[in-house]
Each structure stands twice: as C-alpha cells, then as structure tokens.
C-alpha cells in the first residue's frame, strides 16, 4: 500500500519544515493551497520549490485541490464544520476530481508524496479531506507530519 503524508507549515520555519519532510522520507511535496503564496518567508510557490529542490525534493502545485475563498474564510473564523462542508462540495467539481486523479497518479507512481497546506492541525485543514478522498481512489496510508516549532 502506498503512503501519503500531510504537513502544515503554520508554526514551522523552512528549516524545521524540511527536517520534518526528510524524517518522513518525503520525495515530492504536493501543494494543495488554492493560492500558493504566504506571508511566512520561504513558503510562497517559487521560493518553496527552490528550497525543496535544494533539499532534493520535488514540488507540484495542485491548485484545484485548494480550498475555495469561502472555505478559507470559514477556516480563519474557526468554523471547521463549515469548511468541511464547503470543501466536500468543492471536491465534487470536475476540476477538483481531475486534480485528485493527477494526485492519485503521482502517488501511484511511487514517490513518497506529502500534501502541503498552512494549517498546523490536520484536523482543521482541508488536506485531511484531500487525503481521505485520495484513499477512495487508491489504497493509501495517511501519515501526518508535524514540524518542530521555532
């Protein structure tokens, strides 16, 4: 059975983030943010991809698996049940289903993939819903990585 990891960088530095990825044996980071930019240094798309490449890891942005704006607003307000409801509806869209198939193909090809988003707590993040949806497409074991806080 393939394994897929998840990680949130909310409380991490680039160093502790990459250490957690290395400890988890990650080879490719799949960015599941709708908008791959960040106020946290080193976590916007181009810089993140460069940091990962320096560490010997690949990067792919799966934008259509990102949370719609209304889901991000619900998450910021701590309305996690609403976020889950909005995101499940989003997962039913053709674009999200296609991106999920792309993710399944990547995971099925063999590299250890890690789903990336901001939220530190996987139970409050849509990446857990992505992992669950992936498990409906291909058999995967899900492991949540937790970078050290700094």
What is the meaning of each model-derived region?
Residues 1-150:
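Residues lining hydrophobic/aromatic ligand-binding pockets adjacent to catalytic sites
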């Amino acid at each position: 059975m393939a394994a897929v990891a998840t990680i949130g960088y909310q409380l991490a530095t680039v160093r502790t983030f990459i250490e957690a990825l290395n400890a988890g044996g990650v080879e490719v980071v799949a960015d599941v943010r709708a908008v791959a930019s960040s106020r946290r240094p080193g976590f916007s798309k181009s810089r993140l991809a460069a940091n990962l490449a320096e560490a010997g890891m690949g990067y792919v942005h799966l934008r259509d698996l990102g949370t719609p704006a209304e889901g991000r607003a619900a998450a910021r307000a701590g309305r996690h049940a609403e976020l889950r409801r909005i995101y499940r509806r989003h997962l039913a869209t053709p674009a999200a289903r296609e991106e999920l198939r792309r993710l399944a193909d990547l995971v099925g090809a063999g590299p250890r993939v890690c789903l990336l988003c901001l939220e530190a707590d996987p139970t409050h993040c849509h990446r857990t819903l992505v992992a669950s949806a992936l498990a409906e497409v291909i058999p995967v074991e899900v492991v949540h990585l937790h970078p050290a806080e700094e």
